[in-house]
Amino acid sequence: MRLRLRLLALLLLLLAPPARAPKPSAQDVSLGVDWLTRYGYLPPPHPAQAQLQSPEKLRDAIKVMQRFAGLPETGRMDPGTVATMRKPRCSLPDVLGVAGLVRRRRRYALSGSVWKKRTLTWRVRSFPQSSQLSQETVRVLMSYALMAWGMESGLTFHEVDSPQGQEPDILIDFARAFHQDSYPFDGLGGTLAHAFFPGEHPISGDTHFDDEETWTFGSKDGEGTDLFAVAVHEFGHALGLGHSSAPNSIMRPFYQGPVGDPDKYRLSQDDRDGLQQLYGKAPQTPYDKPTRKPLAPPPQPPASPTHSPSFPIPDRCEGNFDAIANIRGETFFFKGPWFWRLQPSGQLVSPRPARLHRFWEGLPAQVRVVQAAYARHRDGRILLFSGPQFWVFQDRQLEGGARPLTELGLPPGEEVDAVFSWPQNGKTYLVRGRQYWRYDEAAARPDPGYPRDLSLWEGAPPSPDDVTVSNAGDTYFFKGAHYWRFPKNSIKTEPDAPQPMGPNWLDCPAPSSGPRAPRPPKATPVSETCDCQCELNQAAGRWPAPIPLLLLPLLVGGVASR
């Protein structure tokens, strides 16, 4: 225990961001240590190794993880890194470790073990207990997932019935929690599945899926986890491939969403290169495709509230969203009882929206609109706001009941237009109309001296639909069909703002040429001029007019008072 506390203290001191950015919380650092150790970036902590752990090695571990995930290589537990660590992913470690990854040039990784035969057998022994997918659909999806690898190599796969004296090479199970191997599942979200590399051990090649996930295929609303995409990834492990950092690789450790029609799916070049390094190229003869087609479950009629009419599916390209939030690296767009999800890659999970109450389990049925949402930095909880109340979720599960906005420092009966956590100072901002409040999550209390005028964010539109911060640290204000970008560390919008939201965020056609959205008025000093200047300086490091550098220490003490 003492060793762990010393390691946490060392990480807090060495991996903290510069003074202008918020320091990582102890909980985030603990998550980072556990995550980096679990997935192979740090050795397991014990006395002999902890004494040899250097600041450079700790930073290297985080940088390699960031490189693997396609993040800026800061070497710090910044918000984007923490959000990525909280994303659903494969259970297996990113096996090569720091030294191998630093030297590595190719993206794919090989486990060092292969099957010594070219014809492999497989069987699904147990099926998901509470899935919309039939057992036949699950078997067909597994067949197509294996075919994706067989088409690019000299491997063939045969499904076998119940064992007659010998188990198949690849035995597939849907299991929960501890299930007699070294990789227990953790319930909904988190780790999704794992598979074992080839070998002579009875468990070699076996593939396990977390039965507490909501497994789907062909989902029209983006709900659940696509079984085919995860199966293709795990079978890559079962054939001897490790994780890849290539952007388009199915072997990336993080879940990337559906990959399309199984009959048309093809591996990326990086995945083909890794597979053919192990088994050679596919023969010229056509691959024997499965004769069955995977069928999505029949569409279920949407459940309508008892005393209200059904809501038509809105057009995402019209903008005018009720709320927009960055939740664990994905951007959520809320509109009425619907929402869309944008992956970190910039791709929509689905062009069709998901239903609010099917996803956020426990949200009261009478809540038909989410006015604001954000992920709380200190513990990863997700807060949804509607009217003068908010609800707290752990992943998709509601914790407790409705809570009043007065807990966050707002007057009784007040509502919010936007809520966001600003990484430059770790504070939470609550916007209503032309003013905003600020809340200190670490101290669990509202900051004094608020509300303040929103014009201090120079160029921001009044009454925004919402405000969110990207994984890169830029702040975005949204209103109508446009957005205003504030570069990292700045509270002054870019000169070309506003920009159309649809083509840049939601895969919509560019708007026809016409009048631009009106630009908000330029910020003007409020009655307390000094207070206004402090706001501008402490957030962005920029001043309305040149000020001698020697005066800066006298005028501002840092971002904490923003």
From Swiss-Prot:
- Which cysteines pair up through disulfides? They are C317-C508
The cellular location(s) given in this protein's UniProt record come to:
Cell membrane; Secreted, Extracellular space, Extracellular matrix
Query: What organism is the protein native to?
Result: Homo sapiens (Human)
Q: Does the keyword Ion transport apply?
A: no
Chief localization: membrane
User: What does UniProt say on post-translational modification here?
Assistant: The precursor is cleaved by a furin endopeptidase.
| Cofactor remark | Binds 1 zinc ion per subunit.
Q: Where is the lipid attached (GPI-anchor amidated alanine)?
A: A539
Could you say which cofactors this protein requires?
Zn(2+); Ca(2+)
Lineage of the species this protein comes from: Eukaryota, Metazoa, Chordata, Craniata, Vertebrata
Protein's UniProt name: Matrix metalloproteinase-25
In which residues is Zn(2+) bound? C90, H233, H237, H243
Q: In which tissues is it expressed?
A: Expressed predominantly in leukocytes, lung and spleen. Expressed also in colon carcinoma, astrocytoma and glioblastomas.
